[in-house]
């Protein structure tokens, strides 16, 4: 007959096993931004957790309590669709978490004239392989310095 303590420990071990098997490996992205105080930002694209690179160890480590995100808003202004993308960070404790854009602003504003949109779509029809540059305003994706990630 199992004691209550043994049963509790067994349940805890099963719960810990399930929790670790459900955790995913971070998918790090490196964003280099010009015109910013930050030279580059490395973050997990799944959770938004910031990472720092340690060249002596050639490893990325999570930066405690910092969250990075890209926020996109859209609006209609004077017959145009305006899409604004800004880089920001979450801060705060508990339920009082706020998002603020980094300063100086990093991101891009795209304006699409809705009256000429039809003409633009027609002009691009029949041209396979039209590709847009892999950049986000003043930012661009950059390769990581290493693939080694140290968990927290």
Task: Map each language-model feature to its residues.
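Beta-turn initiation residues at beta-strand->coil junctions
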Residues: 35, 121-125
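Residue-level signal for mature regions of secreted extracellular proteins and peptides
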Residues: 15, 26, 132-133
């Amino acid at each position: 007959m199992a004691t209550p303590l043994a049963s509790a420990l067994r349940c805890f071990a099963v719960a810990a096993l399930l929790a670790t098997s459900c955790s995913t490996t971070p998918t790090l992205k490196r964003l280099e931004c010009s015109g910013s105080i930050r030279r580059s930002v490395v973050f997990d694209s799944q959770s938004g957790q910031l990472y720092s690179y340690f060249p002596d160890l050639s490893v990325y480590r999570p930066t405690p309590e910092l969250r990075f995100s890209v926020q996109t808003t859209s609006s209609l202004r004077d017959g145009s669709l305006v899409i604004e993308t800004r880089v920001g960070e979450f801060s705060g404790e508990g339920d009082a978490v706020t998002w603020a854009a980094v300063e100086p602003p990093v991101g891009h504003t795209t304006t699409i004239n809705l009256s000429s949109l039809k003409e633009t779509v027609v002009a691009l029809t029949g041209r396979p392989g039209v590709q847009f540059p892999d950049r986000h305003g003043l930012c661009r994706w950059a390769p990581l310095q290493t693939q080694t990630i140290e968990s927290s």
